[in-house]
C-alpha cells in the first residue's frame, strides 16, 4: 500500500512537471512568434505578421493568460497590425480597447498610458487617410483619448491633433475651430516647449474670428501676433507682412478705412522689398489696397492701384477686371465698364467650366457652392441697375443669368449639360423665339435677409437688339404677401409690383406667348393667375409658359407621346412592419445593381417633422383609380403600374431610376419645411437643410423606424428632395405631384431648394406642382380632367389649362384658391 501511494505521488509529480515544461514550451513559442511578427512587420509584411501574431495569441489563450499584461501587449500589437496592415479600424479599436482594459486591471499604469497614446495615434493615422468630413470623428476621438492620459497637456501629439483639427473645422464649424485653438493655447502654457509656434496659434485664432465675423476679437489676437513679430530679433519680415495684411482686412470690416489702408501699404512695401514688383505677393497687396480705397470711396486712388495690379503679370485677372468694371461704373465710363465686365465674365466662365468638368458628380455641388461668388455667378446688379439703359450690360447680364441660374441642377445632369453652357447666350434664346413671343428671365440678388433686395426681369423679344431690364422691389412683394394669407385675383398690388411695368416694357399684345423663368419669391406665386386692372387674368390675356430657364424653350416645343405610366395614391402610411419588409424586399431583390447610397437607414433627426402629417388620404385612391381607368382606355399607354395601400413603398419608386416611365403621378402627403431666415447657417447649409426637409410620404412611412431598429434594411418611407436628385428620371416626360406645397422651397442662390428642383435635377421634362395646400375634391377634379384632356390628344399645357378652366367654370371650385395654385413647369 505504501509503495502504491509513493508511486502515485511520483506519477503526479511527473505529470505536473511535464505540464509545466509543456506550458513553458508554449509560452516560448508564443514569444518567438511575437518576435517573428514584429520583424515581419518591420520588413513591410504587416498582413502576414498579423496572422503569425494571432497564432501567438491563441497559444496564450490555451495557457489561460487572458488576464495578464503579456496578453494585453499582444492585443495591443494585434490592434496596431490590423490598422497598419489592413486599415481595419473596427478590429484596431476593439483590440486596443481590450488591451487598455487589461492593463488597467493589471495596474500597469505606464504601459496603459502608452497603449492609450498608440490608440490615439492610430486614430489620427486612420483619419488622415479618410475623406472630409468622415475623418473628423476619428480626430475627435483621438483627442478624447489623449485627454484621458494624466499628463496629456504635455504631449506633443496632443498639440498637433488640436492644431490639425482646428484647421479642418474652419470650413464647417468655425466656432469649433476657435474652441480647439484656445484649448491648444492653454495646453502650450503647461510645457516649456511646443513644436507649434504659439504665435501661429494666435494667428489662426485671429483668422477664425475674422471668418466668424467677430472682428474685435480677430483684431485683438492679430495685434498680439503683429506686436510680437515686430519685436523679434531678427524680425521675420514675411510674417510681419502677412499680419499687416490681415490687420488691413479686419480694419476694413470695421469700416476704419484709414487704418486698413495704412496696414495694407505696410504689407505692400514689405512685399515689394522681399519679392519685387513682378511677384504674386506684390500683385495681391496692390489689389487689396485698391479694394480698401474703393470701399473708402476714393475711386481715383482705387483705379490707380487696380491698374497697377492688373498690369502685373501675377495679378488675379478676374477679380481685378471685375473691380475695374465697378470703378469705371462709378466714374460713369460705360465703355470701359463693359469691357472689363465682359473680360471678367469670360475668364471666370472658362475657368469655371474647365474645373467643373474635371470633378466627379458628387464633388461638383461643393465646388459650385464654394465658388459661386468668386467666379461671378451672381448678377452684378450694382452695374446693371446703375446703367439700366446700357444695351451691352443688359446682354451681359442675360448671359450671366443663363449660366448661373440652376447651375447645380446642370451639374447633376452631367457633362453634356455642362458643355452646352459654354456657348449659350442671349442670342441663342432670341433665335428660339418666334415672332410675337417674349422670353423673360427673372433674377434676384441673394442677401442674408431673404425678404429684402432687388428682383430684376430681363425681357427679350425676337426683334430687339438687346434685352431690356425691369426692376422689381422684392421687399414690396413680401410686404404685400404678408398683408394677405395668399395671393388672390383681386389683390391689385401684386399686379402693380410684378406685371405692370413688364407688360409696358415688353409691349405685350393680347395672345402673345411669354416664357417666364422665375426666381426667389416669384417662383412660389401663381403670377400667371393674377388679375389686372381690367379684372382679366394675366394668363388669359397672354399665353404664359413657366420654364426652369429660357434655355428650355426648344424642349417645351417637343411633344412626346406617353407610352408608360406609374401611379401612386391611397397609400397606407401605417403599413405593418411585416408588410413593409415584404414589399420592400420585392423591389430591392429585383435589382441588386441599384446604387447603395440610395438606400438609407432611419437615423436622422427630421423623422418627427416629416412624419407629423400622416392622415390617410381617401381622395387620392379615388383620384388614381380614375386616372388608371382613363389611361387604360388610351391607345398609346401600353403599361400602367398602380401602387396603392401597402404596395407603394419607397423602394418601388427608387427602383425605376435609369428606366423611368413617361408619366409619374404621385398623390400623397407633401412636406416642405424651410427656415424663413438663414440664422447661423451659410447658404450651403441652408440649401442642404431645405433639400433634406422636403419630401413625399410613401407606404409605411410611420413604421419603417420600427423595422430599422431591428437591423433590417428598408427605406424610411420618406422620399426626400436630396434623394430624388440622385436618381435618373431622364426618360420621364411628365411628373404630377398631387400633394400640398410641392412647388415651394427654400430661396437660395442656387435655385428654389425643394421638390421641383430635385425632380428637374433628376432629368424630368415637365412638372405639375402646387404652391399651397390643396383641396382633396378640387384636386381630384383637376387631375381627372387633365388626364382626360391629355388622352384626347391635347398637348400637356393645353390639357392643363383646360383642366384649370374646368375648375374655374364649376360652381363649387370657381374660387381662385382652388385652381390657381396648380402650376406647370417645363
What annotation goes with each model-predicted range?
Residues 26-27, 64-72, 89, 107-116, ...:
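Helix N-cap/loop-to-helix boundary motif
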Residues 59-63, 102-109, 145-152, 168, ...:
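Residue position in alpha-helical solenoids
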Residues 46, 88-89, 132, 174, ...:
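TPR-repeat structural position
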Residues 418-826:
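Catalytic cores of enzymes
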Residues 31-42, 70-84, 116-128, 156-170, ...:
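Conserved alpha-helical positions within TPR/SEL1-like repeat arrays
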Residues 227, 235, 244, 258, ...:
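Alpha-helical solenoid repeat scaffolds used for protein-protein interaction
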